[in-house]
Curated annotation (Swiss-Prot):
Known function: One of the primary rRNA binding proteins, it binds directly to 16S rRNA central domain where it helps coordinate assembly of the platform of the 30S subunit.
TM stretches of this protein: none
GO cellular component: ribonucleoprotein complex; ribosome
UniProt-listed GO biological process terms: translation
Gene3D superfamilies the record matches: 3.30.1370.30, 3.30.1490.10
Pfam families hit by this protein: Ribosomal_S8 (PF00410)
Annotated SUPFAM superfamilies: Ribosomal protein S8 (SSF56047)
A molecular function GO annotation: rRNA binding
Protein name: Small ribosomal subunit protein uS8
InterPro entries: Ribosomal_uS8, Ribosomal_uS8_CS, Ribosomal_uS8_sf
PROSITE patterns hit by this protein: RIBOSOMAL_S8
Keywords: Ribonucleoprotein, Ribosomal protein, RNA-binding, rRNA-binding
């Protein structure tokens, strides 16, 4: 089966694993997914991730993060720009997620950045998803 939206698949796998409080999850690797996982780790939404090489495209293993009393760190993930309806924003029009408590993942000419980083570097791009 051909996957039409690998980013939505990644977000759905994270959301589902988070809902049942799994410690880790695995998904097919790509450079874009690796950049997204890197941002999620840097912003403190996941504990860690690792790239596992195989003879095909590889696998990304994501280790989810929970609070001291097992509460979820990721409360929501929402795909914004979809294959059927792309959403682009200038650096001055980038959205703030929950008043700055969440992040927007933006695909720019300088790679995947958070909304805050894109605003600082004054680059716009495709708004991939919101994470809070």
């Amino acid at each position: 089966m051909v996957m039409t939206d690998p980013i939505a698949d990644m977000l759905t796998r994270i959301r589902n694993a988070n809902l049942v409080r799994h410690e880790k999850l695995e998904l097919p690797a790509s450079m874009l997914k690796k950049e997204i996982a890197d941002i999620l780790k840097r912003e403190g939404f996941i504990r860690d991730y690792e790239f596992i090489e195989d003879n095909k495209q590889g696998v990304i293993r994501i280790f989810l993060k929970y609070g001291p009393s097992n509460e979820r760190v990721i409360t929501g993930l929402k795909r914004i720009s979809k294959p059927g309806l792309r959403v682009y924003a200038k650096s001055t029009e980038l959205p703030r997620v929950l008043g700055g408590l969440g992040i927007a993942l933006v695909s720019t000419s300088k790679g995947v950045l958070t909304d805050k980083e894109a605003r600082q570097q004054q680059v716009g791009g495709e708004v991939l998803a919101y994470v809070w």
